[in-house]
């Protein structure tokens, strides 16, 4: 998302707009002289320039980073004699058989015309070194660009070509045996064409209305709807152009995942991490309803939340706090409930960031001074089972919009990755809404449209607020010259309009000049009057539209209770020696209380730093576009000062340093410490988005030790943090009596904390992540890449199946506090586990159902005799993104040839698809799990009953054909499929429920397990497979407290 308006966003190093096949290109802005050239062939380094001789060897690589369920690839490794490898041999995805050893980058000069590239003859460098492979009888291409020195790459090409000859000879021989070695189990890199929306009955009526409306729009109006008007070129952070002839309004898109950003009279709800820590489905839904209502009252069409990416694979990831925790099922449930709540008020929700936006370092090139964004590399199985899981649940919840991520996935930008957007999102998961880019995440024009992107935000292309769009007028030109099919544009527009109808926004009051609707606030000023097109005015154009921009509609009234309840239930009690908590409101007099740490106080106020881009005072949210302008913030100190019923002596020490004399006479010591992080465009306190480590910040660990070692009474530690923190330096100190992980509580911070400290609310939060004893405990695949490791930074998620607690279980690592853990002020006992089979097991789901309805048919012809030029006398605002063309240059139909390979070979629909979220058979109930829960304590309280599944052991799949001798001498051989072991985590969360019980009360809770819950994604079969054998069902109150066990 964008930087705040007060801050000039840095520019990328490249201004020319270029378009190359999405899976054959380093991103367009890469202009390092070592890697790009204007010549027809790339200049290679002279091998006699003093370099040592190089050794070429093959490295065996297992797909997906494991030896299960994947074939083996051999990757050429160029090694400098006596030196390190010259490139980082990251495996782009589980589908690779071979990687090429060289790469020719786009050769367009930096000074080329910005507006070219849409089928009008842009010069390109020659492609070299591509390796050909067979997939389902078709030809595909793979590229890689890790070689650091091109002369080594040339040698590598020769070696690889020799290997290819041997490989193809082997393939030819194997085809005489059968088709098994056609590698049909390996999904293609590309997926075309983009599936049309409107094939599901739930959306059929909306698509019919949308198709009719779109059919009456001009080309200019259609492009308007797909392209933002530019940064600060409307009242919201994102604004689309209108279609005035059919009275379709400009849409307002506004952050975010914890409330309405840049708006007045709204609520600062606890963010996603705190919400996930409640494990309370009903409460999460209530929060979503309140957020949706506030958006509706403010005139927001599209709320840019919830966030389920990052998933929390990296515990130090800067934006983990925006999402709901480090497990795909927990994330999926919380996201789905939030979406249902938001959309119940007619506001479109946005599931973001699709997908694998796990770290802030190198997510955007201009933020880090590098040529291009990093690539998050993952295998097909982990992509489905971990990262895409919560998005599937969001689509099942009928989400209207999905936002694609900044970085690349498997070396293709997420916002033009056709396998992700067309193949997985729109086909396999049945997504019926529209895909929007994150702000400036679009990196190409033609390829992003063909790859599945439907809306470009904020409209500007490669730079902030420059008015130069990758779509806009260039999309108009591309449709006219037929380089982008008219059918694709029609589907893009219809998806957006259908979502508008689907949420009932056609019934909203129309914005001016037709009515008084639309956004009633400005993201750029708090004053009542202001400019409608702020960026134009800042560029010197005084025609940016002045008027009333803030109507100060009170949207947050009545939502404080919901915010407070979420914050309280999101507090996790992890230590409580001798029942230190809850505190008494009537302690004996005199009673001296010390409150320590700047995290306890208000300091300079909640909005002292724009987008909360600093750490001062109590920590109530992380920083970045996912936060809001707080209407107020109740600090812990303020709430505590009025919490006791009898007279007590409270002395605050709002610094992170303390002298023993300030502690030794206290009857109770409350210590506050925090750890902060946020989005990568803000650097604060030496933190560049991602945390540098998992320790408390600003001397928090030292402060806790000093207080705990000297306090005369018990010490209670309160931690406000964006994720797990390492507590080993103080957690076992005798003086540390109680510890609360209060996460990020939002505006009601102090009030919610007091509710739990004094027992007005039970301590019922549970950890949505694992607290390890060190950062290294989470595994090498969970570490942020802090130093650039290649021309295109590579992050390999080799252990992604083993995220968080799964990694601890796999390697038998003892955490400090496990996933799902949390103490209560009462006690609970689970008993009487009963598992009921609901239907017979079968290995595969039912066949994909046929389309429920026919999607709209579109006119595939470009418009004829339609005026696409700026109207005569039209005053074009500076920086505004228009769809009009200044001239007809480049609009003649052209034989565009730069399409990605496979574009003209339509893909077959996935057997895993067929409805919202996938094949409906995947969500059929296979088993019911019942358990009795009893409150055995003396207080009312809540607990979270958690169900985990262990998959059968010794699961195998048929692999590649291998030679097996028929006779003893081995002179005759046959080919048989190899047997490959399929690995699984020890156990995985599959369901949970939160239950409230009075003292002595018992209740039976019931949870279901679906086919998908009991299946794994087979990269070979490209489907969800339920293995034969017994499943172990575990039920308890955390991932390591599972007293009940049964079989299914």
UniProtKB/Swiss-Prot annotation:
Residues 172-1048 are extracellular. The chain crosses the membrane at residues 151-171. GO terms for biological process: cellulose catabolic process. Gene3D superfamilies: Glycoside hydrolase family 3 C-terminal domain, Glycoside hydrolase, family 3, N-terminal domain, Immunoglobulins. Residues 36-47 have a biased composition (Low complexity). It is an enzyme of class 3 (hydrolase). It catalyses: Hydrolysis of terminal, non-reducing beta-D-glucosyl residues with release of beta-D-glucose. Its main location: membrane. GO terms for molecular function: beta-glucosidase activity. It is found in: Cell membrane. Pathway: Glycan metabolism; cellulose degradation. InterPro entries: Cellulose_deg_GH3 (IPR050288), Fn3-like (IPR026891), Glyco_hydro_3_C (IPR002772), Glyco_hydro_3_C_sf (IPR036881), Glyco_hydro_3_N (IPR001764), Glyco_hydro_3_N_sf (IPR036962), Glycoside_hydrolase_SF (IPR017853), Ig-like_fold (IPR013783). Residues 1-54, 508-527 are annotated as: Disordered. Belongs to the glycosyl hydrolase 3 family. This is Probable beta-glucosidase E. The lineage of its organism: Eukaryota, Fungi, Dikarya, Ascomycota, Pezizomycotina.
């Amino acid at each position: 998302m964008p930087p705040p308006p007060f801050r000039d966003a840095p520019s990328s190093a490249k201004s020319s707009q270029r378009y190359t096949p999405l899976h054959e290109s380093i991103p367009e802005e890469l202009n390092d002289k070592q890697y790009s050239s204007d010549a027809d062939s790339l200049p290679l380094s002279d091998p006699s320039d003093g370099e040592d001789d190089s050794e070429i060897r093959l490295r065996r690589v297992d797909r997906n980073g494991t030896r299960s369920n994947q074939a083996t690839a051999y990757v050429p490794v160029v090694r400098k004699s006596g030196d390190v490898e010259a490139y980082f041999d990251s495996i782009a995805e589980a589908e690779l058989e071979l990687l090429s050893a060289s790469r020719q980058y786009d050769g367009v000069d930096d000074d080329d015309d910005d507006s070219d590239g849409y089928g009008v003859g842009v010069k390109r460098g020659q492609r070299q070194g591509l390796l050909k492979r067979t997939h389902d009888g078709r030809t595909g291409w793979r590229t890689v660009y890790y070689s650091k020195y091109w002369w080594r790459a040339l040698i590598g090409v020769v070696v690889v070509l020799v290997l290819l000859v041997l490989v193809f000879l082997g393939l030819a021989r194997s085809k005489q045996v059968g088709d098994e070695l056609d590698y049909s189990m390996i999904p293609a890199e590309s997926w075309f064409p983009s599936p049309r929306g409107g094939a599901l009955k739930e959306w059929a009526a909306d698509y019919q209305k949308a198709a009719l409306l779109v059919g009456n729009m001009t080309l200019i109006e259609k492009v308007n709807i797909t392209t933002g008007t530019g940064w600060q070129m409307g009242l919201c952070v994102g604004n689309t152009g209108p279609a005035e002839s059919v009275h379709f309004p400009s849409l307002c898109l506004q952050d975010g995942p914890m409330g309405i950003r840049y708006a007045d009279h709204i609520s600062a709800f606890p963010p996603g991490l705190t919400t996930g820590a409640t494990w309370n489905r009903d409460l999460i839904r209530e929060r979503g309803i309140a957020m949706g209502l506030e958006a509706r009252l403010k005139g927001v069409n599209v709320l840019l939340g919830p966030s389920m990416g990052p998933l929390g694979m990296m515990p130090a990831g800067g934006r983990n706090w925006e999402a709901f925790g480090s497990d795909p099922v927990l994330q999926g449930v919380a996201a789905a409930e939030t979406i249902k709540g938001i959309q119940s008020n007619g506001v479109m929700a946005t599931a973001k960031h699709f997908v694998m936006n796990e770290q802030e370092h190198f997510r955007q090139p201009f933020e880090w001074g590098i040529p291009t964004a990093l690539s998050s590399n993952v295998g097909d199985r982990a992509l489905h089972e971990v990262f895409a899981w919560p998005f599937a649940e969001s689509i099942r919840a009928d989400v209207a919009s999905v936002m694609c991520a900044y970085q690349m996935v498997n070396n293709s930008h997420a916002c033009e990755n056709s396998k992700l957007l067309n193949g997985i999102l729109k086909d396999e998961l049945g997504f019926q809404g529209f895909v929007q880019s994150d702000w400036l995440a679009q990196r190409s024009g033609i390829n992003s449209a063909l790859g599945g992107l439907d809306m470009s935000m904020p409209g500007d292309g490669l730079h902030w607020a420059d008015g130069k769009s990758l779509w806009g007028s260039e999309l108009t030109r591309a449709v006219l010259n037929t380089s982008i099919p008219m059918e694709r544009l029609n589907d893009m527009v219809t998806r957006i309009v259908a979502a508008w109808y689907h949420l009932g926004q056609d019934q909203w009051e129309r914005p001016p000049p037709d009515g008084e609707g639309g956004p009633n606030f400005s993201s750029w000023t708090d004053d009542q009057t202001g400019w409608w097109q702020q960026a134009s005015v800042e560029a010197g154009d005084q025609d940016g539209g002045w008027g009333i921009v803030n109507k100060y509609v009170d949207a947050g009234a009545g939502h404080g209770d919901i915010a407070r309840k979420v914050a309280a239930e999101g507090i996790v009690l992890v230590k409580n020696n001798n029942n230190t908590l809850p505190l008494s409101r009537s302690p004996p007099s005199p009673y001296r209380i010390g409150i320590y740490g700047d995290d306890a106080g208000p300091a300079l106020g909640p909005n002292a730093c724009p987008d909360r881009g600093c750490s001062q005072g109590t920590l109530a949210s992380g920083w970045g576009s996912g936060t809001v302008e707080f209407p107020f913030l109740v600090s812990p100190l303020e709430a505590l000062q009025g919490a006791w019923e009898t007279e007590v002596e409270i002395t605050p020490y709002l610094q992170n340093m303390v002298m023993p004399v300030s502690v030794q006479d206290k009857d109770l010591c409350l210590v506050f410490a925090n750890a902060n992080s946020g989005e990568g465009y803000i650097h604060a306190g030496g933190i560049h988005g991602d945390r540098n480590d998992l320790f408390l910040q600003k001397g928090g660990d030292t402060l806790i030790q000093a207080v705990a070692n000297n306090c005369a009474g018990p010490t209670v530690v309160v931690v406000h943090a964006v994720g797990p923190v390492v507590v080993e330096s103080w957690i076992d100190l005798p003086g540390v009596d109680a510890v609360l992980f209060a996460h990020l509580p939002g505006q009601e911070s102090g009030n919610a904390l007091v509710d739990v400290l004094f027992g007005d609310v039970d301590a019922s939060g549970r950890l949505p992540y694992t607290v390890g004893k060190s950062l290294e405990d989470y595994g090498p695949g969970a570490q942020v890449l802090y130093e650039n490791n290649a021309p295109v930074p590579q992050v390999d998620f080799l252990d992604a199946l083993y995220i968080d607690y799964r990694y601890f279980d796999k390697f038998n690592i003892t955490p400090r506090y496990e996933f799902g853990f949390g103490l209560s002020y009462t006690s609970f006992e689970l008993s009487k586990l009963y598992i009921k089979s609901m239907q017979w097991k079968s290995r595969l789901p039912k066949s994909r159902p046929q389309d429920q309805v026919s999607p709209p048919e579109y006119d595939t012809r470009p418009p004829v005799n339609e005026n696409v030029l700026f109207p005569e006398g039209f005053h074009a605002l500076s920086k505004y993104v228009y769809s009009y063309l200044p001239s007809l240059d480049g609009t003649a139909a052209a034989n565009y040839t730069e399409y990605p390979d496979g574009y003209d070979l339509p893909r077959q629909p996935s057997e895993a698809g067929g409805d919202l979220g996938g094949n409906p058979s995947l969500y059929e109930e296979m088993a019911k799990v019942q358990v009795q829960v009893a409150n055995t304590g003396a207080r009312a309280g809540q607990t979270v009953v958690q169900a985990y599944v262990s998959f059968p052991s010794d699961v195998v799949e048929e692999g590649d054909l291998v030679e097996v001798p028929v006779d003893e001498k081995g002179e005759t051989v046959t080919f048989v499929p190899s047997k490959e072991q399929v690995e699984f985590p020890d156990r995985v969360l599959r369901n949970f429920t939160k239950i409230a019980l009075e003292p002595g009360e018992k209740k039976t809770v019931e949870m279901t397990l679906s086919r998908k819950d009991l299946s794994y994604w087979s990269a070979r079969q490209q489907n969800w497979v339920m293995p034969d054998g017994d499943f172990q069902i575990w039920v308890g109150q955390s991932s390591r407290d599972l007293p009940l066990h049964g079989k299914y």
